[in-house]
């Protein structure tokens, strides 16, 4: 028997005996309240009885007569009235029943057994004449709740037997033609509206024989909740309204199969093709196609991105003029005679024999041997330049110039005086050495350099080996035509040297034109000067200063953002030391008798257990620094909290690292002594903020001695012990590099140096037929033995274009060497590359300088990575530089205002 608002109907024949289940009746107070309502509804039920339609043929009662109700019937009528009112309250506040048919309700109450339905179905809307108080039974598609069962027991009376569960009406009865199946919630709402209409009207119109067509009740559509969510929502009042919500997806299917005929405004349905979930977001655009240089666009896209980012960040963090009091003075530069300069000069006066083979150009096998401090003319097609420094190269850096200045480019370097000299790191040592400054001319992107690389001047030092040198990133260069009152000279840059005696020396370099104009006509060529440094930076303090406690200074890093006042150094004992260069504190700054300064650090901490091999600042924020030591650890530091590193990674023995401007991580070169098999080479390591895994940039068989990155190109270059110089274009490291496909397409060789033996004298050797497949040369442990029986062969790659790169001979040779490289470590590695540096200047951003054990320094232009976009940026920078240039005039002293300089002050 179903409970539906105003009454109950027993359909068909009933079993004589039903099962009885005792259910607790409602409280006395609640029944007394319902008695009052029952008296109020007696008049309404009388009107309903008068408006009942006549029965259809075949549905009459067998007696065909109406008997007056007895006292027992009246008692049942009162109970039915009470149950009618209770059903109104319970149905409007009933919770959603469980979705399982024939099981327990949401509250866990068991379904009572009811009487069987009649074999002949009834038409909805018609009344049974045998029961004058019967009401139309609305259809039901869900289970009854516990409240329905309670009302059912109350209406039947505790003394009456229960009827079995009625059979389910057929589908055609539950789903009228032209309508979708209605759920129980819609039926309850419809029944409630019918009761309101009965109270307002005295009679109801006779329903049609085909069945009633109930008006649609519009309700906001919500997604169907799960069974667990619906059970939890019974205690929440808002969750009980789920019975009035239709399932969106099920409604869409039913509406497509049987659309409503009597509804003029159908409910809006979401299109099925609309994606949902995370996949509905905007997809990342793909870079398809090929760039003009022959590389895919997805490889070149990070290069173009880095160009704009570097330009914007340099405008924010770089300066036009800093350290105005440190101007070169002519009388501090003492020109040495030939006899005085001899101890500082490298011992080798001639370079080893070498030859150059360029891809795509037939060579005649020319063998070169050049003098010390000499160079060969740039190749007219490939623009590569070579010169000889006289000894193994261990320190190298470009002189920064402002963007758009179109000025001459300079590199400073240090070569060891002896080819066979070794330097123990555990002990301090000093001795003569020569700091060299080379001029490369105006390196343009459109034309071959017109001038040879030339030795400008040298600085004689007595601090031993120079392990590292760094120029001030910006604000130290001024125009060479700036006129100054004697003895002041226009400044080229500020240079810091990390020496093997534990000191850091700071020099103010003048422009070569102004300095060479001060020397007499019969002066020695090349010019070697003995210079008094601006400042000497030491560890310790004023009262306790012992450089031997920290050992040799192995690495330097200049603060990359303006005002560039801090300089960091890494020492052999694991200390990282910081100096404040313009400090006036008497505890950190002492003026010596010769006019120079001695500076002491303002901060230092123990960063590693062993020697600090390299350090780098974050170029976007000077609060962060990274260091790598001989303890195989890479540590990221926040200088505001130096007591603990931000991130510490122990992987391998790092030789050098590079922190590119756009990315939150460093590219690391490694020694192969601790590397896992197949994993030696170049790695990109995230700083820890993004949590990405290490990205294997390029595999190498031997130790990678040097690594350099170009902020303008988003590219790193590395030179190793086997004499191969390669470049790798990094992907966009702002996203996870684990998804990068085909990393082999992102790297390419620049040149490969091989040590080739010859049988007889160099004049009888056929160099044109010699190749890198020559058998391994005999073991030679000294430089003299090596050059007597070997020569160097440089095999250059055509860098003007990268079309068909994967099938070209240099690329195949590089890939073969990555898997089957032959290293001979028991001889002098004359072909090894020790230092590599990309140009940091916009005017020469595609140029790369490298050198190594042989003392030969080579310059290459990676023309294929340049683009018309970069050329437009260069033109804009030149226009801005010319707008800021002012006519120069003599200045009165070192403390002049920047407004009197050739550049306008910083914005």
UniProtKB/Swiss-Prot annotation:
One of its GO terms (molecular function) is DNA binding. It comes from the Eukaryota. Residues 148-158, 211-221 have a biased composition (Low complexity). Residues 98-114 have a biased composition (Basic residues). Residues 25-186, 203-289, 758-780 are annotated as: Disordered. Keywords: Nucleus, Phosphoprotein, Repeat, Transcription, WD repeat. The modification Phosphothreonine is found at residue 891. Residues 249-258 have a biased composition (Acidic residues). Residues 80-95 have a biased composition (Polar residues). The modification Phosphoserine is found at residues 62, 130, 163, 219, 256, 593, 867, 888, 897. This is General transcription factor 3C polypeptide 2. The lineage of its organism: Eukaryota, Metazoa, Chordata, Craniata, Vertebrata.
